[in-house]
Amino acid sequence: MAFNLRNRNFLKLLDFTPREIQHMLELAAELKKAKYNGYEQPRLKGKNIALIFEKASTRTRCAFEVAAYDQGANVTYLGPSGSQIGYKESMKDTARVLGRMYDGIEYRGFGQEIVETLGAHAGVPVWNGLTDEFHPTQILADFLTMQEHARGKQLSEVTFAYLGDARNNMGNSLMVGAAKMGMDIRLVAPKAFWPEEELVAQCREIAEETGAKITVTEDVQEGVEGCDFLYTDVWVSMGEAKEAWAERISLMMPYQVNMAMLKATGNPHVKFMHCLPAFHGEDTVVGKELAQEYPELKDGVEVTDEVVESKHSIVFDEAENRLHTIKAIMVATLGQ
């Protein structure tokens, strides 16, 4: 069945059916294959795309820019200090201005309501590159990566655990995506870091139709047993005070992904995933500062260096797939 997603916004996975999500994943796989084999056809020739970044980025910005260039589009980058958005001009007005100049707009920033306003008033496709509540482009990359490493399983047959801060945009988005695609997800976190009950209830309602299983637990062994994938993210999100680390570490240490936890899955083929950047040693300024202040973190914070560098880690396949899935979103909503 062909899907027409042309002119649709991509703001959160709650807005899409399982079949539409699967269509975008299949398109991403096709575009990846075409790029690798040298027969990619540009379907965004003559299109102009604006990238609004109110938060810093490596993977998301690079993926959008390279995807656009591969497909023949032109890009304007508007960084945190490069525009009047929110300072002298409202997002509603910005949307109506940029929508007359550009064919598509990406937004990465703060509240979900901001990108929803942009999407409501731009009149062109708007893509969510990350908000405080959701990170939907990352989830498509994650699910494409899972498909590639699931040893023949369909997504609906996959079991995975997300460990750590399950109330953040990654916990929210993985739960929504898993519910939509009929997956078995375990959100393994201290109770204070569980997702909002309203969103959990919404996802469980979706799960009744798709066959998904959603478990929210503090019990690490219950959460990881039998998993195909273990997933984590940083314990302190962008924009949070550095002082937040102290209160998090004692709560979060039992949820650090290490080799013992991989073994606890009982699956010798288990894979490790992380949306990156990851604190897994002292090779960054933040990592070094944390290790000096908290010696127990010298081998890593949310994940140990041993895990990231092990055969179980697929984090760089996952990072590359940001490019192919973001390209699929742009082609599906804007392509000719």
From Swiss-Prot:
Entries under Pfam families matching the protein: OTCace, OTCace_N
Disulfide bond sites: none
Any Gene Ontology CC annotation: cytoplasm
Residues that hold L-ornithine according to the record: 169, 233, 237-238
Chief subcellular location: cytoplasm
Listed EC numbers: 2.1.3.3
Keyword entries, A-Z: Arginine metabolism, Cytoplasm, Transferase
EC category: transferase
One GO process term, biological-process aspect: L-arginine biosynthetic process
InterPro entries: Asp/Orn_carbamoyltranf_P-bd, Asp/Orn_carbamoylTrfase, Asp/Orn_carbamoylTrfase_sf, Asp_carbamoyltransf_Asp/Orn-bd, Orn/put_carbamltrans, OTCase_ArgI
Organism superkingdom: Bacteria
Keyword match Transferase: yes
Catalytic activities: carbamoyl phosphate + L-ornithine = L-citrulline + phosphate + H(+)
PROSITE patterns: CARBAMOYLTRANSFERASE
Function according to Swiss-Prot or TrEMBL: Reversibly catalyzes the transfer of the carbamoyl group from carbamoyl phosphate (CP) to the N(epsilon) atom of ornithine (ORN) to produce L-citrulline.
Listed PANTHER family: ORNITHINE CARBAMOYLTRANSFERASE, ORNITHINE CARBAMOYLTRANSFERASE, MITOCHONDRIAL
Family: Belongs to the aspartate/ornithine carbamoyltransferase superfamily. OTCase family.
Protein name in the entry: Ornithine carbamoyltransferase, catabolic
